[in-house]
Amino acid sequence: MQVTSLLILVCFIAAFQVFSRASSPVNCKWDSYGPWSECNGCTKTQTRRRSVAVYGQYGGYPCEGSAFETQSCKPERGCPTEEGCGDRFRCFSGQCISKSLVCNGDPDCEEDGADEDKCENVANPSCNIDKPPPNIELTGYGYNVVTGQGKKRVINTKSFGGQCRKVFSGDGKDFYRLSGNILSYTFQVKVDNDFNYEFYNSSWSYIKHTSTEQNTFYSWKGLFSHSRNTYGHGSAKEEIDTKMKSYKLLVVQNTVEVAQFTNNNPEFLQVAEPFWKELSHLPTLYDYSAYRRLIDQYGTHYLQSGSLGGEYRVLFYVDSGSAKETGFQSDQDNACSSADFQFLFTSSADQRCMKQLETEKSTSGNKGRLLRGKPLVRGGDSGFVADLSFLDLDNPAGNKQRYSSWAGSVTRLPQVIKEKLAPLYELVKEVPCASVKRLYLKRAIEEYFDEFDPCHCRPCQNGGLAIVVETQCQCLCKPYTFGSACEQGVLVGDQAGGVDGGWNCWSSWSPCVQGKRTRSRECNNPPPRDDGKSCLGETTESKQCEDQDLEKLRLLEPHCFHSSLAPKEFCLSPPALKDGFVQGEGTMVPVGQSVVYACDEGYSLIGDPVARCGEDLQWLVGEMHCQKLACVLPGEMNGMQSHPQKPFYMVGEKVTLSCVGGMSLEGPSTLLCGSSLKWSPELKDAKCVQKATSTPPPAAPACQPWEKLQNSKCICKMPYECGSSLDVCARDESRNKILSLTICKMHVVHCHKRNYTLVGKESCTLPSPAEKVCGACPIWSKCDAQNGKCICREASECQTAGYRICVEVNGKEETMSECEAGILRCRGQSISITAIKPCAEEAAQ
């Protein structure tokens, strides 16, 4: 990838700069430490961080020591990984996976294999092959676009996700099984036999050209950093001699591809277990220090797609002044094309370009017939890299052989090249308060980028470009200029002229005024002068006082926010709307917040759908009503069913009626939706009646809810056949172990003669109520069609009652259905289930 090579190039360029006495060195200085973070309930530690107050520049020293400090502490909150997983399987680590992956023959719990730990046997293994493609783990690493380096693994490349997808190896000798996180994987070797050769009259030109080709947001924010993956040769004396010079560049490059891959969409990716743990440990109160540590370990992005292979790139440099004296000019003057330089690897030579390279060789201090450069190589055996640092002008076959040796090793030791990236915050999921943490990680990455904004640097002279490298600022100089501040040399040609302006850093955000905050910046780093260009962009910026996304999450997930930040005053439930409802309605809404109304299916809202909670705790509601648009059938049809079944029917549509359960229909069998939005004939004229039979069939036995009918007999259900049911704590008396069950499962295990006793809810950790999507609503909630999520039912809306149980509410026991109890719990009311059957008084009647 070009970004990485540019990162390494800057390190290479920095090695050949010298800091002139004309610019006084500026040493890096740390700012004071910030406050300690909240004590982490999992690690029992807290951290604090200090930022750079003054970046080192002009040869000054970098900051010493770490930006972070850690100490042990006593947490006030528990560890999120100790919580339950609802209806999913919980690995020993705390990570949750789908129950469909349990006992399928594949260890989908990445670190402990708990999903296969207690399986007596696996009747049908999900696949007959378990070998993944070689080096597949490379596709799951994080990536830091600021440093240009790969980081720790963020995607679980070992999980097959219960799938059996195979791919044939490139050499046709073997099959491999693909990870469930891989969308596509192809073994296709691509070797470009034609090398690419490019001349640049300065490192400045090279950076400008390559960043323009990248055309990405990070072209300037993420191009500059030290890298330890480069290989250089030459003594300290040679480096000191060359630091006082300005250079031209010849870049020779090529790539080798072994395989191509595309990762799945983020919502379908299973994150690596160590990364998942770190996400779980992140605080729900924004603390940049904690999120910054995650960025340091796992990067800013993850791999969306790319190739496994190797990249060969060598930079050859020539002193600009010597080149001018000896007649070696830029490619515009001597016009050596890529084809003209093939003589470096083939026997056919171009004398004009040979002379050009001989000039470069002599001016850059190379002796004999060897042309030395700086190899920037990714992939392949590192033992071959030293041989790639030079070209023998008299032995093109030897040059090609050394390259071929390295290229041949790429199949064994590939790296990811030609990668496409996606933001890391997309992978924040399957942890408590994931939506809040995702928003905070996005904010932290933006703040991290700001740390490397060149606005922190002092201006470079002669139009040089200031860049941030770790805790130091460096100047990238224009052609024929050099020095620590680019103060030496002379600008020539179209580079000469005035000084363009540069932005200073943004100010802090102002206090909140009329619902908005503002900040500003100045074009004075440096200010434009001598007809130089002014800065592009705005001098001021404004935003809402409260992040709208954060405010929405504060309502949907109030448990994710510190109690001191919670609103203190609320309006009661908003007024009801006939044939309509409030989207995402809670029991209480904070002052200043708004709710939005919507209409039932078959109705359209006329008027202003927004109501606001006023400061007087009264609802400010405009005129609105729901207007009927179609014919609607009632929810209860007394044994009748309709075909086709639809939420509503437009004018002219017909519906056919029939009866269920051996009943026969009396009255009209077909209804028409008329122009008045009424059924013709009327639905009340149709009804279902019992058929007269001479010999009624023998009645099937009436099974209990925890039983099922099999071969005309009632037998006990299995626990996995239970549907939606309330969670309770139960003690297994045979093992004296307390665990979480549901009311349905307790009835089932009792049916199987297992001795389980109901205990208090404080005796175990019950699964936290997770937000459900439509299609998975429990019996005490219903689907909100507007946002596709489940909301609490009203007590009168219970369609499936569940078991009759004994519940203590406000200190008094009463018998109610699971649905009724679930509605109370859904609405936040504290209840205690004292018996899984009706209360003793009612049971005795």
Curated annotation (Swiss-Prot):
Keywords recorded for this protein, A-Z: Complement pathway, Cytolysis, Disulfide bond, EGF-like domain, Glycoprotein, Immunity, Innate immunity, Membrane, Membrane attack complex, Repeat, Secreted, Signal, Sushi, Target cell membrane, Target membrane
Which residues of this chain are annotated as glycosylation sites? N124, N201, N755
**PTM (free text):** C-, N- and O-glycosylated. O-glycosylated with core 1 or possibly core 8 glycans.
Main subcellular localisation? secreted
UniProt record, GO biological process: complement activation, classical pathway; innate immune response; killing of cells of another organism; positive regulation of immune response
Which positions fall inside the Sushi domain? 569-628, 629-690
The text of the family note is:
Belongs to the complement C6/C7/C8/C9 family.
Q: Any idea what this protein is called? A: Complement component C7
Q: Supply the gene name.
A: C7
